[in-house]
């Protein structure tokens, strides 16, 4: 929370990742789909950092390409259960939801990259990174042309960074003085 607040003071928005958690799996979602077999009742500790950051004004979350079969049959980044029910309704999150990179191995089960993008949007994602694959980006843009959700657009506009305070203004704040004392 302190890091997020410091970023906000500096004019930046923070993104919490990888909701609902990536810590109890072995597989690397860049290459394969990790599976976490714990039931939702055992994931409360994983959700606590998100709950705290949301209560303190978190503006965006990136969802994980991790499958939690005891909760939903779709991985979190393609799951309305995780994005709409748990994150938005359960934790009260109103900010932007990023998919993890749709070109990753953990997303491959969902079909072509444009199909992955459509499934992520249907689940509730607002922004869809597609890294290092220009042809897939172009195919996705063509296939999803006109699919913009006005509510997603509003959430994304709210992410625009705040004007960064002048360095001299920052030096006059109590936070600056406190940090300086800690460093010295």
Which residues make up each language-model segment?
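Second-shell residues forming the walls of enzyme active-site clefts
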Residues: 1-152, 157, 165-167
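A short C-terminal boundary segment appended to hydrolase-like catalytic domains
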Residues: 153, 159-184
